[in-house]
């Protein structure tokens, strides 16, 4: 008979895989930044915030804080490395005040996590108390991360289009939330259950919106394509007309020259 711990580990491994997919989802954005040599209007805040979330979960998973949480450490340690890579690329292609702001946020995060670690490890003397303090902070940051798609969901409702809410990422978020909620329930862990349970709710809400607005999205895309095709056709007509009647173009140029 398979033990609960074995099932929990298997679910955690799947959860690590889906979480890795989510961590890697911004790669196309950074490929664009690399090619253009500029961060344009992109913000570093999501990556700095995700880094803080990962650092706090690594602290939570330490044997001295919450034993038997190796899978929590591995995926969030990997997430830290990925987010640091994103931030390094952002810094490489940003200038002046933007770069200084990111560096300041980064320094503040490192100082905050270091202070929490020092205080918890020195002033809290049991695993239960350490887990509670760090866990509450993780719930706060984790809930904030999972609530981030609310802005996208608002845009979907306003525009009646799911064009900028990829189905694949919504499905990955759902599977990830389910895996980590199940992982936390097998050996009950309130602090992992809360943010991931909320993550499941937000992912389900995204999928419901996708089902509601899928048809209207296709109509919007088709209307845009027709408009672009009409614009191209009209441009071609104007160009052909100018070629076939060059005197009118010369007359127009002369008229413009008089004014």
Swiss-Prot record:
Top-level taxon of origin: Eukaryota
Family: Belongs to the SWEET sugar transporter family.
Molecular function terms from GO: sugar transmembrane transporter activity
One Gene Ontology term from the biological process aspect of the record: carbohydrate transport
Protein name: Bidirectional sugar transporter SWEET4
Extent of the signal sequence: none
Cell location: Cell membrane
Quaternary context: Forms homooligomers and/or heterooligomers.
Transmembrane stretches, start-end: 11-31, 45-65, 78-98, 102-122, 132-152, 166-186, 192-212
């Amino acid at each position: 008979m398979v033990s609960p711990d074995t099932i929990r580990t298997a679910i955690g491994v799947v959860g690590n895989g889906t979480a890795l997919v989510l961590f890697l989802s911004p790669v196309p954005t950074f490929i664009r930044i690399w090619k253009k040599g500029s961060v344009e209007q992109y913000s570093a805040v999501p990556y700095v915030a995700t880094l803080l979330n990962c650092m706090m979960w690594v602290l939570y998973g330490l044997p001295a804080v919450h034993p038997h949480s190796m899978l929590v450490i591995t995926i969030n340690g990997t997430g830290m490395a990925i987010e640091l890579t994103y931030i390094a690329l952002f810094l490489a292609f940003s200038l002046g005040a933007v770069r200084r702001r990111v560096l300041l946020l980064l320094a503040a995060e490192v100082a905050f996590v270091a202070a929490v670690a020092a205080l918890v490890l020195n002033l809290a003397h049991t695993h239960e108390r350490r887990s509670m303090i760090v866990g509450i902070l993780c719930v706060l940051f984790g809930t904030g991360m999972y609530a981030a798609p609310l802005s996208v969901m608002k845009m979907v409702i306003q525009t009646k289009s799911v064009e900028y809410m990829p189905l694949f990422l919504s499905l990955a978020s759902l599977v990830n939330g389910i895996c980590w909620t199940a992982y936390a329930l097998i050996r009950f862990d309130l602090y992992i259950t809360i943010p991931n349970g909320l993550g499941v709710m937000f992912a389900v809400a995204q999928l419901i919106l996708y089902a509601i607005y899928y048809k209207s999205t296709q109509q919007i895309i088709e209307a845009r394509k027709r408009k672009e095709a009409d614009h191209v056709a009209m441009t071609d007509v104007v160009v052909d007309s100018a070629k076939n009647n060059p005197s009118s173009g010369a007359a127009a140029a002369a008229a413009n020259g008089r004014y």
